[in-house]
Amino acid sequence: MNNKFDALKDDDSGDHDQNEENSTQKDGEKEKTDRDKSQSSGKRKAVVPGPAEHPLQYNYTFWYSRRTPGRPTSSQSYEQNIKQIGTFASVEQFWKFYSHMVRPGDLTGHSDFHLFKEGIKPMWEDDANKNGGKWIIRLRKGLASRCWENLILAMLGEQFMVGEEICGAVVSVRFQEDIISIWNKTASDQATTARIRDTLRRVLNLPPNTIMEYKTHTDSIKMPGRLGPQRLLFQNLWKPRLNVP
């Protein structure tokens, strides 16, 4: 996908006297210095809905990560491996990103897509996540694309009705199965986690006997490596009843 902001270029090719050339050169150097200072200080242009666009309640950021199977990953190397795709603030901006992204079912190897509220990194150790947890569901191969789309559309549409509790969602593509999860801020709030569970069942049209696992990020941090929920054992790999024309 092309960058949302094109670089500004000065393509003037006419004759200038020496003073104008020096002035232009100085202006260019000043702009470069100002730009470098802005980048080094971490300043970014705020993402806002465009004219006539439909704003979301929160801004969200897409992330992507991929790792080598069987190789333990530290928090530092995991953070370096995860790549930010882009941030959006409206329905229209979301579809501009999503329509250009590979669907989870077409990913290979140990790959993950993450969709989190802007400012929250998809890491257990992030301040917004460290006291929270996630609902985890394992999927048979071939179901991840539809379930992922249903999940993130429900999240963007505020269907979970739990205020600011939702942090984000993850789809993890593995060799024999895929995993989806939704993260919330407060693992100790049983009423909130129960509401998230019930909404997740509804938006994914899960059968009543579907096995769902809630795992706190504190427990995930204690486990060696970055495998987290993939190490949990599930008896049923469910197949949802999808209403397909």
UniProtKB/Swiss-Prot annotation:
GO molecular function, one term: RNA binding
Primary site of residence: cytoplasm
Entry binding sites for mRNA: Y78, E79, H110, W124, E125, R174, F175, Q176, E177, D178, I179, K222, M223, P224
One Gene Ontology CC term in the entry: P-body
Disulfide bonds: none
PTM entry text: Ubiquitinated by ARIH1. The consequences of ubiquitination are however unclear: according to a report, EIF4E2 ubiquitination leads to promote EIF4E2 cap-binding and protein translation arrest. According to another report ubiquitination leads to its subsequent degradation.
Phosphoserine modified-residue sites: S13
Cross-link (Glycyl lysine isopeptide (Lys-Gly) (interchain with G-Cter in ISG15)): K134, K222
Entry superkingdom: Eukaryota
Family matches, as Pfam families: IF4E
UniProt note: phenotype after gene disruption: Lethality; mice die just before birth.
Oligomer and partners: Interacts with EIF4EBP1, EIF4EBP2 and EIF4EBP3. Does not interact with eIF4G (EIF4G1, EIF4G2 or EIF4G3). Component of the 4EHP-GYF2 complex, at least composed of EIF4E2, GIGYF2 and ZNF598. Interacts with GIGYF2 (via the 4EHP-binding motif); the interaction is direct. Interacts with EIF4ENIF1/4E-T (via YXXXXLphi motif); increasing affinity for the 7-methylguanosine-containing mRNA cap.
Its job: Recognizes and binds the 7-methylguanosine-containing mRNA cap during an early step in the initiation. Acts as a repressor of translation initiation. In contrast to EIF4E, it is unable to bind eIF4G (EIF4G1, EIF4G2 or EIF4G3), suggesting that it acts by competing with EIF4E and block assembly of eIF4F at the cap. In P-bodies, component of a complex that promotes miRNA-mediated translational repression. Involved in virus-induced host response by mediating miRNA MIR34A-induced translational silencing which controls IFNB1 production by a negative feedback mechanism.
Protein name: Eukaryotic translation initiation factor 4E type 2
Species annotation: Mus musculus (Mouse)
Name of encoding gene: Eif4e2
